[in-house]
C-alpha cells in the first residue's frame, strides 16, 4: 500500500515518487487515449504512465523553476522538468513567455511547444461585489509575497505615490517568505500609516477586496501567466501589470510597465486615482475585455492538440 497524502509533505520528492507509483497502477488498470501532466510535480508520474501504457504524453507548463527562483534554479527540480519535457510528445505552455523559456532554457524544439493562454471563471453574480464609498483611494497587491512576485517594487512605488499625495492607501494581501522584509521596508520608507498587511485571502475574500480597490498591481518579475489581473478587471478594478507576465500578451486594457520601473508604476497609480476619466475607461473597457476571455476557447485549443498528438501529427 502506497502512502499518498495529496498535499505538500516535508519530503516532497518522496511524495512525487508515491504519486508516480499510483499513476503506474492506474496506467495498468484504466483505458485511456492520452496522458496530461500538469507541472513538474506530476511529470515523473506522466512519464512512467507513458512507459507502461504506450500512450502519448502531453505536459502542461504553468511555471518553471526559472520563474520561481529568479534564475537561481534548483538542479533537482530542473532535472525533473527537463526529463518530463524531453519525454513528452507535446508541451503546452500558458503563455508565449513560458514557451520561450521552455525552448531556450530546456532545449525543446519549437514545433513541439504550443501556447494555450489561461482564462478566468465567469462570476455567477458580479453585481454582488460592490465598491464602498471612502475618502482615500485603495491600491492592492494580492498574491504570494515572494521574490517572483516583486513585492518590493510595489512598496517602492507606493512610497513615490505618497510623496505626491496622501489620499491613497496600499494593501499587500498574501503571505510568503518576504513578508517580514516588506513590513520592515514599509517602516523604513515611513509609510506604515498608509500600508496594510491583511494576510492570506481566498475565495470570496479575494473578489471582495478586488472589487473594493481602485487599482490592482501585479509587479511580477517573472509571471508565466497571472490570472489575478483578470479577476480584478472582472469586478471593475483597473490593473497595472508587468511586461514580464504572460497575461500581458492578451490584455489590451491594462497598463503595462517593466517590473523594475517603479517611477512608471507610480505614475500609472497616480493617474488612475487622480483622473476619473482614466479610471472609468480602464474599469469599463477592462471588464468588457476580460468577459470575452473564456475557458471554453482554451479548451478547444487543448482538444486540437490532443487530436494532433493522438493522430501522430
Feature annotation, model-predicted:
Residues 221:
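Aromatic "clamp/platform" in nucleotide-sugar-dependent glycosyltransferases that forms part
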Residues 1-29:
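A conserved catalytic-core segment of Leloir-type glycosyltransferases
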Residues 238-241:
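Short hydrophobic beta-strand element within catalytic cores of glycosyltransferases
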Residues 97, 119:
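Carbohydrate-associated surface elements
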Residues 200-201, 208-213:
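Short alpha-helical donor nucleotide-sugar binding micro-motif in glycosyltransferases
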Residues 254-263, 271-276:
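Conserved acidic donor-binding segment of nucleotide-sugar-dependent glycosyltransferases
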Residues 181-201:
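Nucleotide-activated donor-binding/catalytic signature segment of Leloir-type glycosyltransferases, i.e.
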Residues 132-158, 283:
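Conserved donor-binding/catalytic core segment of Leloir-type glycosyltransferases
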Amino acid at each position: 500500500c502506497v502512502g499518498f497524502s495529496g498535499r505538500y509533505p516535508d519530503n516532497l520528492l518522496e511524495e512525487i515518487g508515491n504519486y508516480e507509483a499510483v499513476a503506474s497502477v492506474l496506467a495498468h488498470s484504466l483505458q485511456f487515449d492520452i496522458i496530461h501532466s500538469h507541472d513538474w510535480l506530476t511529470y515523473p508520474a506522466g512519464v512512467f504512465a507513458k512507459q507502461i501504457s504506450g500512450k502519448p504524453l502531453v505536459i502542461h507548463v504553468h511555471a518553471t523553476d526559472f520563474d520561481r527562483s529568479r534564475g537561481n534554479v534548483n538542479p533537482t527540480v530542473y532535472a525533473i522538468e527537463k526529463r518530463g519535457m524531453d519525454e513528452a510528445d507535446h508541451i503546452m505552455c500558458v503563455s508565449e513567455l513560458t514557451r520561450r523559456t521552455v525552448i531556450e532554457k530546456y532545449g525543446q524544439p519549437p514545433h513541439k511547444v504550443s501556447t494555450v493562454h489561461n482564462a478566468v471563471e465567469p462570476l455567477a453574480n458580479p453585481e454582488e461585489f460592490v465598491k464602498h464609498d471612502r475618502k482615500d483611494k485603495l491600491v492592492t497587491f494580492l498574491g504570494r509575497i515572494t521574490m517572483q512576485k516583486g513585492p518590493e517594487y510595489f512598496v517602492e512605488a507606493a512610497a513615490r505615490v505618497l510623496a505626491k499625495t496622501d489620499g491613497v492607501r496600499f494593501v499587500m494581501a498574501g503571505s510568503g517568505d518576504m513578508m517580514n522584509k516588506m513590513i520592515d521596508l514599509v517602516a523604513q520608507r515611513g509609510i506604515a500609516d498608509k500600508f496594510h498587511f491583511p494576510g492570506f485571502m481566498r475565495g470570496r475574500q479575494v473578489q471582495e477586496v478586488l472589487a473594493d480597490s481602485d487599482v490592482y498591481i501585479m509587479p511580477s518579475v517573472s509571471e508565466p501567466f497571472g490570472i489575478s489581473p483578470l479577476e480584478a478587471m472582472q469586478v471593475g478594478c483597473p490593473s497595472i501589470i508587468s511586461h514580464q507576465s504572460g497575461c500581458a500578451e492578451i490584455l489590451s486594457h491594462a497598463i503595462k510597465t517593466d517590473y523594475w520601473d517603479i517611477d512608471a508604476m507610480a505614475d500609472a497609480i497616480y493617474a488612475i486615482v487622480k483622473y476619473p476619466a482614466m479610471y472609468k475607461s480602464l474599469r469599463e473597457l477592462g471588464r468588457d475585455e476580460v468577459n470575452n476571455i473564456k475557458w471554453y476557447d482554451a479548451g478547444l485549443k487543448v482538444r486540437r492538440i490532443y487530436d494532433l498528438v493522438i493522430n501522430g501529427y
